[in-house]
Amino acid sequence: MSIQVKFFASLREKTGVAETIIDAAHTAADAWDKATGGMPQPNNVLVAINLEYASFDAPVKAGDEVAFFPPVTGG
């Protein structure tokens, strides 16, 4: 099985990837590296695994959805 990786807002533009499928990853950081081809992670990126906030060192498994998005700001 595979892992679905999504990028939102400005991260979509920076990575050039909206959504991709990777074969495997051990952590969310590993999923970032594989989905972006090793692009450095910008500061303050948020990650969610299966719609729940997580850290970059959180484990991922086959069938998971990993989403990356910039911090939410408002005013």
Residue positions per predicted region:
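Ubiquitin-like/PB1-type beta-grasp interaction modules and other compact soluble beta-rich domains
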Residues: M1-G74
